[in-house]
Amino acid sequence: DRTVTGVQTCALPISFECAESQPLTHLRITLHPDGGIARLRAYGEFWEEERDSNFDGINVLSKESGARAIYANDEHFGCLSNILEKHEPLSMADGWETRRRREPGNDWGVLALSKPAQVEKIIVDTKFFKGNFPHTFSLSTAYIVNEEDSSIIESSQSWTKLLERQKLGMNQIHTFDKKDIIHNETFTHVRIDIYPDGGIARLKFIGKFV
């Protein structure tokens, strides 16, 4: 065991930096002498043992692997981060769904991996989306380090295409392999474009961290 922060005087709310930044798996909070707290949040980065970095065939674009949603232009019916979940979709609300577009254009979102990766298979699941799945979608990637999310969002329109526009069907799993994937370059961020709108339940990138 090690102490990551000493005794803190409570305020409403209170925030502080940890005394060290070593990887950890568990947190214990001690109240002096008693009382209650409403929320505890620990901010940081997902850390993965080196032995797992070269393991092939994992979903590098999942919350379990440390991926996160940065931005979506529309999350009217469901959050973009839902498509990173490991568990099977529970309902339409468990996916990412945008409102019907009345104006030109398409909906899109930006995702970040926990570390650089390469992909060999892409899976898109439209489970539960029957009359409201996107007609087509495409994927783009970029290798970015030490940039603010705001600048990443702005630059995403010019990223390298990973998958050209592909048709989607209702309530089914779609798989795209090496013959569909345009490049095998290492990347850290993904942009998904759906045309024109709609919902998907899950997006998986099967590959390896490098």
Give a label for each model feature:
Residues A19-P33, I182-P196:
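Noncatalytic modules at the cell exterior or secretory-pathway interfaces
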Residues L27-I29, A117-F128, I192:
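A short beta-strand element within beta-rich, extracytoplasmic domains
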Residues G35, K127-H135:
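Extended, low-complexity, turn-rich repeat/linker tracts enriched in Gly/Pro/Ser/Thr and Asp/Glu
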Residues G35-F46, G198-V210:
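Edge beta-strands of jelly-roll/beta-sandwich modules across compartments, strongly enriched
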Residues Q22-L24, P104-N106, S114-K121, E185-F187:
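Extended extracellular/luminal ectodomain segments enriched in beta-structured repeat modules
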Residues Y43-S114, K130-N132, S155-S156, R165-L168, ...:
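Disordered, acidic Ser/Thr/Pro-rich linker "stalks" and the adjacent N-terminal cap
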Residues N132-V145:
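Short, surface-exposed beta-strand/strand-loop-strand elements in extracellular ectodomains
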